């Protein structure tokens, strides 16, 4: 039987027949059709720490002495209204943006630090 004939036979099978075929192949060859699942261990934790994060939370740690400039910058980067931006700055430390890309996070951090705020990327 050629590969094309096998593929054609599989195309003509019902879902139930395909399920039975998979189970028969698992039994015959001693394999599993389940997707491999990584088990986290001590080595995996160390390897995970070496991987670079792709999403960051931008946290306003402290507004500094130039609070008005910081409020303006917060409004600019978040799109919030004056009242909301002021409340956010007054309530520091507060998260400005969640799951930001590294470049977005760095840009927001630079803009706020430029006006005297202390910002952290977590």
Swiss-Prot record:
Keyword RNA-binding present in the record's keywords: the answer is no
Q: Which domain of life is it from?
A: Bacteria
Q: Which Gene3D superfamilies match?
A: 3.30.1390.10, Single helix bin (1.20.5.710)
**Gene Ontology molecular functions:** mRNA binding; structural constituent of ribosome
GO terms under cellular component: cytosolic large ribosomal subunit
Q: Does the keyword Transport apply?
A: no
Which InterPro entries does UniProt cross-reference here?
A: Ribosomal_bL12, Ribosomal_bL12_C, Ribosomal_bL12_C/ClpS-like, Ribosomal_bL12_oligo, Ribosomal_bL12_oligo_N_sf
- Where does the signal sequence lie? none
Keywords for this protein:
Ribonucleoprotein, Ribosomal protein
GO term, biological process aspect, one = translation
Subunit info here reads: Homodimer. Part of the ribosomal stalk of the 50S ribosomal subunit. Forms a multimeric L10(L12)X complex, where L10 forms an elongated spine to which 2 to 4 L12 dimers bind in a sequential fashion. Binds GTP-bound translation factors.
PANTHER family in UniProt: 39S RIBOSOMAL PROTEIN L12, LARGE RIBOSOMAL SUBUNIT PROTEIN BL12M
Described purpose of this protein according to its UniProt entry: Forms part of the ribosomal stalk which helps the ribosome interact with GTP-bound translation factors. Is thus essential for accurate translation.
Question: What is stated as this protein's family in its record?
Answer: Belongs to the bacterial ribosomal protein bL12 family.
| Protein name (database record) | Large ribosomal subunit protein bL12
